[in-house]
Swiss-Prot record:
Binds 1 zinc ion per subunit. InterPro entries: Ribosomal_uS14, Ribosomal_uS14_bact, Ribosomal_uS14_CS, Ribosomal_uS14_sf. It comes from Pelobacter propionicus (strain DSM 2379 / NBRC 103807 / OttBd1). Keywords: Metal-binding, Ribonucleoprotein, Ribosomal protein, RNA-binding, rRNA-binding, Zinc. Binds 16S rRNA, required for the assembly of 30S particles and may also be responsible for determining the conformation of the 16S rRNA at the A site. Zn(2+) binds at residues 24, 27, 40, 43. GO terms for biological process: translation. Its cofactor is Zn(2+). This is Small ribosomal subunit protein uS14. The lineage of its organism: Bacteria, Pseudomonadati, Thermodesulfobacteriota, Desulfuromonadia, Desulfuromonadales. Part of the 30S ribosomal subunit. Contacts proteins S3 and S10.
């Protein structure tokens, strides 16, 4: 889990647009972020496996 101070800091609007860093909206993780879902890979996998994300299904071939 991310520090509360880092999550609050990332929610503020940066002085320059280039300073913006995406964070997972669920856990606050800054790395392995999927823009389409606004989640990190760990939360995406967790919520997709229990069917919380519409349109995402487990792949099989």
């Amino acid at each position: 889990m991310a520090k509360v101070s880092m999550i609050i800091k990332s929610q503020r609007k940066p002085k320059f647009k280039v300073q913006q860093h995406n964070r997972c909206e669920v856990c606050g993780r800054p790395k392995a972020f999927y823009r389409k879902f606004r989640m990190c890979r760990i939360c995406l996998r967790k919520y997709a496996s229990i069917g919380q994300i519409p349109g995402v299904i487990k792949s099989s071939w």
